[in-house]
Every structure is written in structure tokens, then in C-alpha cells.
Design a protein with these regions (language model features):
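Residues at secondary-structure transition points
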Residues: 26, 48, 52, 59, ...
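Class I SAM-dependent transferase core
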Residues: 1-74, 80, 117-127
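Conserved SAM-binding loop of SAM-dependent methyltransferases across substrates and taxa
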Residues: 86-99, 163
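A generic alpha-helix surface/boundary motif
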Residues: 7-9, 87, 113
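Conserved S-adenosyl-L-methionine
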Residues: 81-85
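S-adenosylmethionine
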Residues: 77, 99-103, 107-164
Length: 164
């Protein structure tokens, strides 16, 4: 990542109470490069400019700290990201908060393959990737009512999503 984007990312994260260390910054850089590589073969995101990805995907994903306390995220909890797509917001949360057990769920197996590859490259042991539809997974006793938090971006309207 360029120095100016790095500096801006660090400053913007600090504004929402997140101190990014070198390991986290390196992970976001690897994530970004892997996203571009896979996006060339399959459509993961229309947003590909480095500045935009860091602002509109990575930083936006971390705004969960406006709703869930940093203390809760730091001490550990479980979070399911329904319809995660390219891993937003779940993967950025997993990078910054390693004590959060993140379950990434998507209905397209090719996106799960990308996510598994990214998780492996980042060495994240706190992430599980699941190929499933939300409405099917909601009936699975292994996951039903087992998560502390659930998040989603651009999957369905809230009333539909809350049924899952």
C-alpha cells in the first residue's frame, strides 16, 4: 500500500478508536492484493482502487466499533457475517480483533474459495468459512442462536434478514 493510503488508513482507524499495528497493516495489504488477483477472474467487487478499497471496504467494516464496544471485541465474542461476499465486514474485523471468532457465510462456493485462500494467506485461526444460504443455515442447530453478533452488508432488507 502506498504511504499516503497507509497514513490515511491509520488516521481514520484511530478516529474510530482502532490502533493499527504493523501486522494488521501487512494483513490488509495482503488481503487487498489477493482481492485484486481473484477479482480479475471473478467478480468480487466493483470497487478496486486502492484508496477506495481501504476506505469503503476495510475502514467501513471496522465501524462495528460504533455499535459493539472495543472491550467486547477485544475480550472475544462470536460474530457471523451473512452474505459476506469478498469478506466484508467479517475479515477486517477478524484481522483487527483476533479474539473474535468470525464465521463467514456465503451462498456462492467460488467466493468461499477466495475467502479460504485469503484466510490461509493471512494465517487467521479465528475465521471459519461456510458455503450455505442464510435461510438454510438458520435451521442448523450448530449455528442457530449460537452467535453473539450477526452482521451483513447489502444482502436483504432488515426485516427479511432478521428472520434468518
Amino acid at each position: 500500500m502506498t504511504e499516503s493510503i497507509k497514513r490515511e488508513f491509520i488516521e481514520n482507524a484511530a478516529e474510530i478508536g482502532i490502533d493499527l499495528n504493523d501486522k494488521m497493516l501487512s494483513s490488509f495489504d495482503i488481503y487487498y492484493k489477493n482481492l485484486l488477483e481473484w477479482n480479475a477472474v471473478m467478480n468480487l467487487t466493483a470497487i478496486t482502487e486502492e484508496k477506495d478499497v481501504f476506505e469503503k471496504h476495510f475502514l467501513d467494516s471496522l465501524t462495528i466499533t460504533k455499535i459493539v464496544s472495543r472491550e467486547t471485541l477485544c475480550k472475544g465474542c462470536t460474530l457471523m457475517d451473512l452474505g459476506t461476499g469478498a469478506g466484508f465486514p467479517g475479515l477486517p474485523i477478524a484481522i483487527v480483533f483476533p479474539n473474535v471468532k468470525v464465521v463467514l457465510v456465503d451462498s456462492l462456493n467460488k467466493r468461499i474459495k477466495f475467502l479460504e485462500d485469503t484466510v490461509q494467506k493471512l494465517g487467521l485461526s479465528n475465521v471459519t468459512c461456510i458455503h450455505a444460504r442464510a435461510e438454510e443455515l438458520s435451521r442448523n442447530k450448530k449455528y442457530r442462536e449460537k452467535m453473539d453478533f450477526c452482521c451483513s452488508r447489502a444482502v436483504a432488507n432488515l426485516s427479511t434478514l432478521s428472520e434468518y
